[in-house]
Amino acid sequence: MFKQFLSKLPRKSSKSDSGELNRSSSGPVSSPVQRSGTSGGGSGPVRSNSGKRMSSAVFPASVVAGIEPLVPFKDVPSSEKLNLFVSKVSLCCVTFDFSDPGKNSIEKDVKRQTLLELLDFVASGSVKFTEPAILAMCRMCAVNLFRVFPPNYRSSSGGENDDDEPMFDPAWPHLQIVYDLLLKFITSPCLDAKVAKKYLDHAFIVRLLDLFDSEDPRERECLKTILHRVYGKFMVHRPFVRKSMSNIFYRFVFETEKHSGIAELLEIFGSIVSGFALPLKEEHKIFLWRVLIPLHKPKSVGNYFQQLSYCITQFIDKEPKLGSVVIKGLLKFWPITNSQKEVMFLGEVEEIVEAMSVMEFQKIMVPLFLRIACCVTSSHFQVSERALFLWNNDQIVNLIGHNRQAILPIMFTALEKNAQNHWNQSVLNLTLNVRKMFCEMDEALFMSCHARFKEDEAKQCSAAEKRKEVWARLENAASMKPITGKTAVLVTPRATSIAC
């Protein structure tokens, strides 16, 4: 088997091969390697001849120089090191099935040692990479890394399935070295971005982004670092990277609600947003409105909420006027039936409102505190507690104080109902503290609201008594003359202004 493994390596290139190299090096790669459903990074069986022909069409094998790949770098002169590099890289294009640890163990070890040699060589930065070397490297990474993942049948319900164990790829010992090699290669000062951009092109980047759907968290962590370096080094690709990431978010929010790497992608985008120049471009604001705010909608938002909040905070730090836009978006996607999400939303609201000016706060205070009033009276004590904790924030209390004429009438009924009826002692104590705070803030306004509350309460009691009397008369009339035949009964439901 070892002889068969070595026999796969190309020998001394012919003149026709050299001509093909010149032709292939003159233009960029048009598309990445298209792979069938084998597991990647060598985790599937050795590819068929048709698969190799397809790979050769994209990254031609003729770039391989005629030099023995198992020779150490230290044993060849400097003039031959790049040829040896290309030869070793081509050796690593052979893949194996890692689901069976005992299969092809010698060949796997040879490949692993070769990858480690390549890693040391790239890290040394001793030779400037030529176009054939870049081409061979991209081809090897495509063959080993790019693959189609099996369908993900896990639930997208987020926090409800936190006990799910992460899936680990059996090929990771090899995949990790390939990822480390790609990272060292991209960040190497010996790599000319102007030349490499022809091979690390849009198609390569799209396939790299597809790998973020891997269920192996180790792979996603490596991809996060690599994509960040690609974004930093290849400025010409930056708009395309942002657009491709947006497409992944769109597909996740509006179609599938299933993706393993949303948190990692958002983490990358957070660092991208922090580098945006001022004033913000319209396309960046559109990304906030159409992508980041709708990302609050999926059930699995808890899996990436921290990274999402960071991205939004970065936008607001860049342009504080966006705070009111974000609050309106949060109110639009407010999770009325999901208490855990409500707690998270309240935390994000606090972070945003804390940084708002009085003018921006006034734009959203009425709808915001209508929602907060509903949260305060929630029977779920964590929601009610988190809403009342807003009054522990001095900056928010200061904003409320400046606008108490509008906010206290909204909140008063919720506070009184809590003080009278809430079952949780902690919520009851917090309610009384907030109530006392409002009273000390403006006693005259507080007493006015209290009088109005008592008046409304009396009206409600009176209306309830009238309804009771009407029903009593109806029941009395019905008992004297029972309904006969097909008598239509019209019932009109009472409309409500806001759902709590």
Curated annotation (Swiss-Prot):
Induction (UniProt): Induced by epibrassinolide.
BP term (GO), one: signal transduction
Record has Cell wall biogenesis/degradation as a keyword: no
SUPFAM superfamilies hit by this protein: ARM repeat (SSF48371)
Compositionally skewed regions (Polar residues) per UniProt: 21-37
Quaternary structure note: PP2A consists of a common heteromeric enzyme, composed of a catalytic subunit (subunits C), a constant regulatory subunit (subunit A), and a variety of regulatory subunits such as subunits B (the R2/B/PR55/B55, R3/B''/PR72/PR130/PR59 and R5/B'/B56 families).
Chain's role: The B regulatory subunit may modulate substrate selectivity and catalytic activity, and may also direct the localization of the catalytic enzyme to a particular subcellular compartment.
Family: Belongs to the phosphatase 2A regulatory subunit B56 family.
Protein name: Serine/threonine protein phosphatase 2A 57 kDa regulatory subunit B' kappa isoform
Classification of source organism: Eukaryota, Viridiplantae, Streptophyta, Embryophyta, Tracheophyta
